[in-house]
Amino acid sequence: ADKEKILAADGLILPGVGAYPTAMAELERRGLVAVIKEAVAQGVPLLGICLGMQILTEKGLEHEETDGLGFIPGVCRPIPASKEQPVPHMGWNDLAVKQASPLTDGLDGQAVYFVHSYFTDVPIQYIDVTADYSIEVPAMIHKDNVYGAQFHPEKSGDIGLGILEKFAGLCKA
């Protein structure tokens, strides 16, 4: 992706599968961190999915401490392992809406698909939706025009498609 296309976009999606340090290193290598920050500062909506949500935080603790994009205060930490809930967290979990946002309408009690070993430890005012997985995992977070979904909406059937449609509605297109 080049700078002009990103800055001209009506919305941005940071997808994700992989590791926090690798993702941030690749964004830096491509010169995209500053461009993404500039686009968000100009009001372009940003949706981070899975790892894309995790790197919205200030730092991650996967393998090593790594600076994130810093859009949402907090740290990405390992999910504590337990006998009842294995890590990685893979599968369907029900959502609990904690506060309304443009993406959360109709999500309370709905099941979505997760694949992750880390969670975003962020202040409560940025947590829109949670899922119970031995701990209360932030499933959706947001601050201003920056949104994150820890689960994979693209793998979550009609519920997930609805979230993506709502995000598209936030974009200028």
Regions found by a protein language model. Give the residues of each.
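A short, well-structured beta->alpha microelement
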Residues: A1-K5
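An anion/phosphate-binding loop that grips the pyrophosphate of nucleotide cofactors and donors
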Residues: A9
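Cysteine-nucleophile active-site neighborhood
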Residues: G18-M90
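Histidine-centered divalent metal-coordination motifs
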Residues: C50, H116, H152
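Pocket-forming structural segment of enzyme catalytic cores
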Residues: E58-S134
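Short, surface-exposed beta-strand/loop micro-motifs that present aromatic residues
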Residues: E136-K143
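Acyltransferase
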Residues: A149-A173
